[in-house]
């Protein structure tokens, strides 16, 4: 029986990895062994950074809410505590959208429910 050295299976696997790393710099996009390491690392980073993005967005929303709240001489923590006590079910994302896109209604929300 003739010997088959992986045939097209290995070529397909290598091509897939090289396609994944096609935008990378230098040998990282041309040589399979290096490209394979970089592809694994890139996929790991993308997995980690999806969780980081959630953290970063939450802190951005908090910064935006705090900025507009402090213009009204109210601290962020007091604002959130008061909204919870009044049972206003707006999460931080919604509050940040209001603060950025519809500032007058956000200020009205603060003034009517906190005073």
UniProtKB/Swiss-Prot annotation:
Belongs to the bacterial ribosomal protein bL20 family. Binds directly to 23S ribosomal RNA and is necessary for the in vitro assembly process of the 50S ribosomal subunit. It is not involved in the protein synthesizing functions of that subunit. It comes from Chaetosphaeridium globosum (Charophycean green alga). GO terms for cellular component: chloroplast; ribonucleoprotein complex; ribosome. It is found in: Plastid, Chloroplast. It holds the Pfam family Ribosomal_L20. This is Large ribosomal subunit protein bL20c. InterPro entries: Ribosomal_bL20, RIBOSOMAL_L20_CS, Ribosomal_protein_bL20_C. Disulfide bonds: none annotated. Gene3D superfamilies: 6.10.160.10, Ribosomal protein L20. Keywords: Chloroplast, Plastid, Ribonucleoprotein, Ribosomal protein, RNA-binding, rRNA-binding. GO terms for molecular function: rRNA binding; structural constituent of ribosome. Its main location: plastid. One of its GO terms (biological process) is translation.
